[in-house]
Amino acid sequence: MILRQVRDSAADAEAVRRIARSAFQDLAARTGDAERSQAPEEEARTVQQLARTRHLARTDPQGCWIAEHDGEAVGAALSMRREGVWILALFVVLPAAQGQGVGRLLLEQAAAHGRGCLRGLLCASPSPAAARRYRRAGFTLHPAMTLAGRVDRAGLLDPGDIPVHPGGPVHRHLLDSVDRSARGAAHGPDHDFMLAHYDELLVADTLAGSGYCYRDGGSVKLLAATSKRIATRLLREALARVPDGTQADVEFLTAEQEWAVDVGLEVGLALGTRGYLAVRGMRPPAPYIPSGGFL
């Protein structure tokens, strides 16, 4: 078996996507999640996954690795450094190659990219094996909640006096500033990716504080704010903009994001649990809803 860096190529991006799909479908089947194990591939999601792999291969080549056995890609890890925070964006091994040390070698290689970083952050699947590996790597695992369902428009409360408006590249300084306040590090070039691939960016900027939220279809992809009041306003606005008939979903909510749970319940979303938000050298960011792909 050999480990090599992920190349910024269509072939490597497709290899990573194939491994991830196989690994996550197998996990869903083993954990009894029939909806995820049988879910068809969505073209838009596939395009985003391929583009994200190539994006990280460009921004963080030392943090993105593929494991190959007899010429076949059997595992992958995508990670990044953002201002002193090491972030593991993806860590997957083909089901047939699991339990053979592939994951350990991949994680060690990716973690070397974060050498010197005092803090670490990742969104973990419900995989018991992955949870053990992250805990051994020094991460604290915070059980995560999910919100899902159709938005009950009658539950959308009066938004109050905090204005929310569409954002864009001109707000990059504000976005990075809010990131640093919430999680201790800016997303930097990842904002360029999200602006290009998600439906919209919502921004709130007042004398009392600032915040932003990315929405893509029914998914709240990332939310950060300097106060719970602004975060609540942004989440309500994002859910109000979910197209009629589209399932809304919000993932990786820790206990610190009770404000988000309250908003979701107000609009009729169902509360569940899935996976973990794992942190090292830091508390879970708050008020904050992490991006599964960029944290």
Describe each model-derived feature in a short phrase:
Residues A20-C64, E68-A73, R180-E200:
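Active-site rim helix/loop that mediates acceptor-substrate recognition in acyltransferases
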